[in-house]
């Protein structure tokens, strides 16, 4: 999103996490004269900016989907660790069905255990004590929820910028159509007055 702003004063624009804010154009004629653009160039600039916003929105939505899928997995892991901690010391074995492959399950009998293995990603698994695993999973859950809140706020900011940009495009287009009609009417009015 590093294209230059034709508004003439880039200091008015703020941004949120690298997403530039769209500036509402109050007076199209003043905007065009200050930026030195003709209506077609201004429309092209704002349509390009709109496309950039759409690309960023798709990336943020993908991140949001990933986080929304990750949070239930972390919660499920926390429940399993809590169950293992609760069964520890009782002397009874825990029967668990786990998925080996898609649609293929196996049954395991888990005796008293002091540790669990967690997938950390990138084909890395580490063994943790139940307490450490629980603390790590709680921390990961808090981080994922905080990241999701930030993403939701970023998406709302982005949607606001898309709306402002769409309104700006409509205003510039309508102003251009109005100016063309005025130019067409003026020669016709002069021709009628001359005859």
UniProtKB/Swiss-Prot annotation:
Disruption phenotype: Reduced levels of alpha- and beta-tubulin. Altered development patterns and disturbed microtubules (MTs) organization. Hypersensitivity to high NaCl salt levels. Increased capacity to tolerate freezing temperatures upon acclimation (e.g. 7 days at 4 degrees Celsius) associated with a continuous accumulation of HY5 in cold conditions.
Main location as per UniProt: cytoplasm
GO biological process, one term: response to salt stress
InterPro entries named among the record's database cross-references: PFD3 (IPR016655), Prefoldin (IPR009053), Prefoldin_subunit_alpha (IPR004127)
Inducing or repressing factors: Accumulates in response to cold.
Post-translational modification N-acetylserine, affected residues: 2
Localization of this protein: Cytoplasm; Nucleus
Keyword Glycosyltransferase: no
Top-level taxon of origin: Eukaryota
Biological role stated in the UniProt entry: Binds specifically to cytosolic chaperonin (c-CPN) and transfers target proteins to it. Binds to nascent polypeptide chain and promotes folding in an environment in which there are many competing pathways for nonnative proteins. Together with other chaperonins, contribute to the regulation of gene expression by modulating the spliceosome function on pre-mRNA splicing post-transcriptionally by acting as a co-chaperone of Hsp90 to control levels of LSM8. Required for the biogenesis of tubulins and for subsequent microtubules (MTs) organization and dynamicity.
Family: Belongs to the prefoldin subunit alpha family.
Subunit annotation: Heterohexamer of two PFD-alpha type and four PFD-beta type subunits forming prefoldin co-chaperone complex. Interacts with PFD6. Binds to the DELLA protein GAI. Interacts with LSM8, a specific subunit of the LSM2-8 complex, which is a core component of the spliceosome.
Official protein name in the record: Prefoldin subunit 3
Organism whose genome encodes this protein: Arabidopsis thaliana (Mouse-ear cress)
